[in-house]
Amino acid sequence: MPSQAVTYTTAAVAAVATGFLAYAVYFDYKRRNDPEFRRQLRRSARRQARQEKEYAELSQQAQRQRIRQMVDEAKEEGFPTTSDEKEAYFLEQVQAGEILGQDPTKAIDASLAFYKALKVYPTPGDLISIYDKTVAKPILDILAEMIAYDPSLKIGTNYTGGVDVAELMREMASAPGVGLD
């Protein structure tokens, strides 16, 4: 009796494989010889690509809206003012960002934690260069959107005196060249 079950199973598998092969041959024949079928395939591919593009744009807009909402909520909560509170808050937020950054589904939450740490850090420009070396790119991209949305965040280093190198570089870039080729 077991050999009969094996025979039925083999026959069923062979029938399914033959059916699949026959459909593949038929599809290839229609694709090569029927111009209307080819047009229909192209239309279908274009329609699908357009739907995917629209979905990507909508999801990107939704993500931007969520990022803005999270930044606004963080600003409403406020940030510490004393140096001891800032230091503790900074360490807490960086640690939270590192933990959340290990899970790719929590990239926005990790970025928010790094953003909060950036808000209390005395020289945000230096911290961004550290983030650039240690934080994953998707998180950095979201963090960049958060920074771009918040005009109160000054990225340049807090410089207390002497020559402001960033301002000097901007002035030099706007001045005509001397021709030092």
From Swiss-Prot:
Segments in the Mitochondrial intermembrane topological domain: 1-5
InterPro entries named among the record's database cross-references: MAS20 (IPR002056), Tom20_dom_sf (IPR023392)
SUPFAM superfamilies: Mitochondrial import receptor subunit Tom20
Gene that specifies this protein: tom20
Transmembrane helix as UniProt keyword: yes
A GO CC term attached to the entry: mitochondrial outer membrane translocase complex
UniProt keywords, alphabetically: Membrane, Mitochondrion, Mitochondrion outer membrane, Protein transport, Transmembrane, Transmembrane helix, Transport
Similarity annotation: Belongs to the Tom20 family.
Annotated GO biological process: intracellular protein transport; protein import into mitochondrial matrix; tRNA import into mitochondrion
Cytoplasmic topological intervals: 28-181
Stated role: Central component of the receptor complex responsible for the recognition and translocation of cytosolically synthesized mitochondrial preproteins. Together with tom22 functions as the transit peptide receptor at the surface of the mitochondrion outer membrane and facilitates the movement of preproteins into the translocation pore.
Claim: Transport is one of the keywords in the record: yes
Subunit annotation: Forms part of the preprotein translocase complex of the outer mitochondrial membrane (TOM complex) which consists of at least 8 different proteins (tom5, tom6, tom7, tom20, tom22, tom37, tom40 and tom70).
Membrane-protein topology: Single-pass membrane protein
Highest taxon of the lineage: Eukaryota
Protein name: Mitochondrial import receptor subunit tom20
